């Protein structure tokens, strides 16, 4: 399946994800493909520990991490279904030499999200972008700092002006999820195409 967004397809919803085993940033974009307009972006963070465990698994039969991933994937599936999302974009796992064990966990989470998306529907586009690609889409490659992504998104009016709620109240996970979705739009359509 190609990853292009069809023109004149009407309203399409996209879910973008900043994956994590404890906190997972989510953003839901409403896109109008006829006018290439971002109608709205709703962003939030899922705190996995606070989710109900409906897996039916006993902790002595499954690891805590496995149960957390199941809980997270169930919520992601519900979000995809309730928004009728046609596109799901995730940040890809990355290797950090200061935290090498985190790579395996992220890989497991993103693989589980990928499987969940495809179990939800074959017509759903799924792709992922490395953190470096996300930073490059915001012209932030090589710039270090905790609030770099937050500040760079404020410089993109076609995104910043469409965020529902108070931007200053969003945490880094939900902000990163917004940036991941923006990366998809830039990679597939180019900068300044969406308004």
Region locations from a protein language model:
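Phosphate- and other anionic-substrate recognition elements at nucleic-acid/protein interfaces
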Residues: 1-195
